[in-house]
From Swiss-Prot:
Family per record: Belongs to the bacterial ribosomal protein bL25 family. CTC subfamily.
Record keywords: Ribonucleoprotein, Ribosomal protein, RNA-binding, rRNA-binding
Superkingdom as given in the UniProt entry: Bacteria
One MF annotation (Gene Ontology) recorded for this entry: structural constituent of ribosome
Keyword Ribosomal protein: yes
InterPro entries for the chain: Rbsml_bL25/Gln-tRNA_synth_N, Ribosomal_bL25/Gln-tRNA_synth, Ribosomal_bL25_b-dom, Ribosomal_bL25_C, Ribosomal_bL25_long, Ribosomal_L25_dom, Ribosomal_uL5_bac-type
Keyword Nucleotidyltransferase: no
Quaternary structure and interacting proteins, as annotated: Part of the 50S ribosomal subunit; part of the 5S rRNA/L5/L18/L25 subcomplex. Contacts the 5S rRNA. Binds to the 5S rRNA independently of L5 and L18.
Protein name (record): Large ribosomal subunit protein bL25
Record organism: Pseudomonas fluorescens (strain Pf0-1)
GO cellular component, one term: cytosolic large ribosomal subunit
GO biological process annotation, one example: translation
Any Pfam family: Ribosomal_L25p
Role summary: This is one of the proteins that binds to the 5S RNA in the ribosome where it forms part of the central protuberance.
Length: 200
């Protein structure tokens, strides 16, 4: 049984006005499901069920069982549109998962052993919070682990420094973009402190 499930209903009343009415009057989130060998479907889901699902970070990078009017299909979250001030989900895009067919997904990054470079006097800057990956559905990781145990002051951790899980490829690297993920730098000194030190 899939731990990540959502119930939805097909909707025929489309357009921005219809979506606003769904959110305002029925506390529903409009969404679209596409991909695979089926036509796109416009659906709606209870806002409270969507919010509850997203309380678990793993839902963003996990195969979700979507029950649309009694028909179940496996999907992943492709995009979420949130309210700019309140943060709740206003619209969602889902992509169907096809067994044996590679998919791309956004996976959160987990940094571990951050205390090691801090003990050496360094400060850590996280450059990214998530990484786009390509893999088969069965290989989709819940997160990508970045180990900073051996990082020194001046270290820049790039995608190529991270060991990808078996069967997983970093999309940016495949396109020649070895982007920075994190860096360790010396503590920044306030201008006032620098001037006082020079005066002494």
């Amino acid at each position: 049984m899939n731990d990540f499930t959502l119930n939805a209903e097909l909707r025929s009343d489309l357009g921005k006005g219809a979506s606003r009415r769904l959110r305002r009057l029925a506390a529903l989130v409009p969404a679209v499901v596409y991909g695979g060998d089926k036509a796109p479907e416009s659906i709606s889901m209870l806002a409270k069920e969507v919010a509850k699902l997203l309380e678990n970070e793993a839902a963003y990078s996990h195969v979700i069982e979507l029950n649309v009017g009694g028909t179940k299909q496996n999907v992943i979250i492709k995009a979420l549109q949130r309210h700019p001030a309140k943060g709740h989900v206003m619209h969602a895009d889902f992509v169907r998962v096809v067994a044996g067919q590679k998919l791309t997904a956004i996976v959160p990054v987990h940094f571990i052993n951050e205390a090691a470079p801090v003990k050496k006097g360094g400060e850590i800057s996280h450059v990214v919070a998530e990484i786009e990956v390509s893999c088969l559905p069965k290989d989709l990781p819940e997160f990508i682990e970045v180990d900073l145990a051996n990082a020194e002051i001046g270290t820049i951790v790039h995608l190529s420094d991270i060991k990808a899980p078996k069967g997983v490829e970093f999309v940016a690297l495949a396109h020649g973009d070895d982007k920075a993920v994190a860096n360790v730098h010396a503590p920044r000194v306030a201008p006032e402190a620098t001037e006082e030190g020079a005066a002494e």
